């Protein structure tokens, strides 16, 4: 299995407030992307960790190429930056026949323990598994959910974590059959998209 950190988005919800690219925003003198890569690198299940910036995030690209240049199991591949879904599908095709664990660079509280728990609980009944949380749980932490899913009259939000079996993807243009893994955990609920989210993450970090 390959871990893929998607960090090539424009980060438009944060870009209006700062010139610093979202993956390079800092909590306790450490960038968001470093928290994520560090957690993934501690997981023995991954053959390698691939960081994917794009032309939208040139500073991030330069930063990760420099800081991880001597790490044998960490690779940097630049995407075209044409949008999350398209970039993701190109990576799925590129890394066949591997399974991919995809996530953004905006989950500062993720850790190796929760990553292992996610993988251990995956039932491979669909080529795509998305990790979701109850909307009310995310809101109870103080985060405003972005991607909302309604299932059986209950509202959920996407954690930003997706596991894909590339062998189940026959065509880059196909609509993937998706199953959901419910996991109400703070470690994956704090998804930093705005400066307010960043401030909340900083305050939660000081409480822990």
In which residue ranges do the predicted regions lie?
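N-terminal nucleotide-binding beta1-loop-alpha1 segment
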Residues: 1-18
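Short beta-strand/turn micro-motifs composed of small residues
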Residues: 7, 53, 104, 132-133
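Active-site glycine-centered loops adjacent to acidic/histidine catalytic or metal-binding residues
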Residues: 9, 106, 194
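Short catalytic helix/loop segments, enriched in acidic residues and glycine
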Residues: 22-35
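Conserved N-terminal catalytic core of the sugar/cofactor nucleotidyltransferase
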Residues: 32-99, 112-113, 151, 156
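Short beta-strand-to-loop acidic/aromatic patch adjacent to the donor-nucleotide binding site
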Residues: 98-106
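Conserved core of the sugar-phosphate nucleotidyltransferase
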Residues: 110-193
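Charged phosphate-binding loop/patch that engages nucleotide di/tri-phosphates or the phosphate backbone
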Residues: 189-208
């Amino acid at each position: 299995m390959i871990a893929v950190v998607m960090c090539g988005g424009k980060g438009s919800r944060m870009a209006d407030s700062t010139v610093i690219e979202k993956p390079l925003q800092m909590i306790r003198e450490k960038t968001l992307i470093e928290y994520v890569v560090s957690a993934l690198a501690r997981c023995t299940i991954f053959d390698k960790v691939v960081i994917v910036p794009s032309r939208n995030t040139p500073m991030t690209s330069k930063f990760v190429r420099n800081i991880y240049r001597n790490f044998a199991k960490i690779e940097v591949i630049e995407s075209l930056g044409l949008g999350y879904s398209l970039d993701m599908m190109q990576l799925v095709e590129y890394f066949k026949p591997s399974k991919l664990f995809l996530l953004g660079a905006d989950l500062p509280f993720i850790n190796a323990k929760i990553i292992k728990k996610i993988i251990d609980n995956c039932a491979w009944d669909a080529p795509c598994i998305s990790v979701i949380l109850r909307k009310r749980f995310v809101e109870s932490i103080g985060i405003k959910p972005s991607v909302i899913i309604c299932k059986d009259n209950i509202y959920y939000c996407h954690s930003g974590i997706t596991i894909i079996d590339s062998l189940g993807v026959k065509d880059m243009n196909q609509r993937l059959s998706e199953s959901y893994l419910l996991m109400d955990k703070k470690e994956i609920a704090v998804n930093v998209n705005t400066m307010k989210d960043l401030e909340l993450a900083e305050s939660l970090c000081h409480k822990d």
